């Protein structure tokens, strides 16, 4: 993928200083400045006790640069309010759809942001390798928070050559299929429990509704310079399901090649859906229309009754039109993208990571805040429409108001099933955020063959 962060629609630049959302009421206008590392365990009292260790940061400004843009940017901006009120600092937020390219342009020009949300660990490795003097190792407070509130694997994703740089931020579950509960009920369709049942359901929809022009699936992979990432998620989900977690992890490190028969078999299964003109692209167009449809719009034909299913991550909840009821009995909901057997339930997921590019106390404090339970719970409360979760164990699931977020959190916290972190996010940036996206787009837009695509991606691996 591409991560959770390539999915965003327009550029948004805003300061959260003037926002009116009150997530926490601070106990004093001028916080005390006691010693501490910023690793408080949370505050239920609504005061600034958990923020005291950050010190008095009045008059200080921290700039944040991300690829998260409207409509997903506002909850992030709102979630900074408690930190601003309790420390006196101001957070200046900038989101850009061209983040992946522009961050490196800014680093080359010496115009680095204080904080950046890195959507791919592979990109983090690239930045550390190319700009070692620009990026700053994570603060002690940040490191302590991650040790306490996250599984060890998450810290590993933000570590390069033994040095910890970037703390996890949000997390997401990719293994979802969005659908209309009422459309399923009206047609007597049941939620598939295996991959074969999913294909059988798709064939049943073609038989029942093909003559009406209604398709089983609708999709879009457009995302500016990150176009193609939704298609990579499809392949990752199928590799994880068909080949298993061991092959999946070896694929990430290039021990298993892109043109390995196991990866080719998974791509064949993806093509049986996305390149099947009987299956796609409901309410939008032909197979090639998938490449020109923005990912935000890819699932909307479900609401018009023109398609039945849309495979997309938990964060897609934020892209349904205002007023859409996202629940088991609502306008739309999601079911788990089934495994090959009913007992096999691997989960594909991803997340963003917070890196610092300035060694100042206010920057270290804000990075620590973003790794804390205080921020995770503030962010959950600031996202009333849903579409966001975290792997932070300090997150109270009661603060997740959306049924899909609660379902996601339950999957993220289920250690009995294999969890595969988004493969392209862990690959080198030129592959995971480069050739993989581009070739999957050409696979659809230009009808390149499976072999051509897989060989081209493999050739790009340096």
Locations of the language-model features?
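Short, well-ordered beta-strand elements
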Residues: 47, 58-69, 89-94, 115, ...
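C-terminal capping/gating helix-and-loop segments adjacent to ligand/active sites or protein-protein/ligand interfaces
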Residues: 386-391, 406-461
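Glycine-centered hinge/linker elements that transmit conformational signals in sensory
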Residues: 252-288
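Extracytoplasmic/periplasmic substrate-recognition and gating elements
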Residues: 309-315, 321-387
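Hinge/lid segment of periplasmic solute-binding proteins
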Residues: 46-56, 121-175
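Short, low-complexity, disordered segments immediately C-terminal to signal peptides
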Residues: 26-50
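Periplasmic solute-binding protein
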Residues: 127-129, 154-196, 220-251, 348-355, ...
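Extracytoplasmic "Venus flytrap"/periplasmic binding protein-like
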Residues: 79-152, 182-193, 301, 308-309, ...
């Amino acid at each position: 993928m591409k991560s959770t962060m390539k999915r965003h629609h327009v550029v948004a630049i805003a300061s959260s200083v003037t926002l009116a959302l009150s997530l926490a009421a601070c106990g004093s206008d001028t916080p005390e400045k006691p010693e501490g590392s910023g690793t408080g365990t949370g505050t239920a009292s609504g005061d600034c006790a958990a923020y005291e260790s950050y010190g008095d940061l009045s008059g200080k400004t921290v700039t944040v640069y991300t690829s998260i843009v409207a409509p997903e940017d506002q909850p992030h901006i709102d979630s900074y309010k408690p930190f601003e009120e309790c420390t006196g600092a101001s957070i200046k937020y900038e989101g850009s759809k061209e983040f992946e390219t522009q961050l490196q342009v800014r680093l080359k020009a010496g115009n680095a942001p204080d904080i950046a949300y890195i959507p791919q660990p592979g990109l983090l490795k690239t930045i550390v390798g190319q700009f070692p003097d620009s990026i700053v190792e994570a603060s002690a407070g940040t490191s302590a928070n991650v040790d306490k509130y996250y599984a060890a694997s998450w810290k590993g994703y933000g570590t390069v050559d033994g040095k910890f740089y970037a703390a996890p931020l949000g997390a997401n579950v990719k293994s979802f299929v969005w659908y209309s509960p009422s459309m399923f009920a009206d047609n007597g369709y049941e939620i598939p429990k295996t991959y074969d049942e999913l294909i059988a359901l798709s064939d049943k929809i073609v038989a029942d509704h093909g003559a009406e022009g209604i398709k089983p699936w609708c999709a879009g992979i457009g995302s500016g310079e990150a176009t193609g990432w939704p298609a990579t998620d499809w392949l990752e989900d199928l590799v994880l399901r068909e080949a298993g977690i061991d092959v999946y992890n070896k694929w990430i490190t290039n021990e298993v090649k892109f043109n390995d028969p196991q990866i080719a078999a998974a791509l064949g299964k993806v093509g049986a859906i996305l390149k099947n003109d009987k299956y796609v692209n409901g309410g939008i167009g032909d197979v090639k229309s998938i490449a020109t449809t923005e990912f935000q719009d890819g699932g909307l034909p479900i609401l018009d009754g023109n398609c039945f299913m849309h495979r997309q991550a938990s964060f897609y909840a934020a892209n349904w039109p205002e007023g859409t009821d996202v629940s088991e009995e609502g306008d739309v909901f999601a079911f788990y993208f089934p495994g090959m057997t009913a007992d096999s339930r691997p989960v594909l997921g991803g997340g963003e990571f917070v890196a610092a590019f300035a060694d100042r106390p206010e920057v270290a404090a804000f990075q620590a805040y973003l790794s804390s339970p205080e921020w995770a719970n503030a962010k959950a409360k600031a996202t009333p429409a849903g579409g966001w979760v975290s792997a932070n164990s300090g997150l109270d699931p009661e603060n997740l108001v959306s049924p899909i977020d609660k379902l996601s959190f339950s999957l993220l916290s289920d250690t009995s099933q294999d969890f595969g972190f988004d493969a392209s996010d862990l690959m080198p940036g030129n592959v995971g955020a480069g050739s993989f996206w581009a070739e999957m787009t050409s696979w659809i837009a230009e009808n390149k063959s499976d072999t051509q695509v897989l060989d081209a991606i493999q050739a790009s691996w340096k």
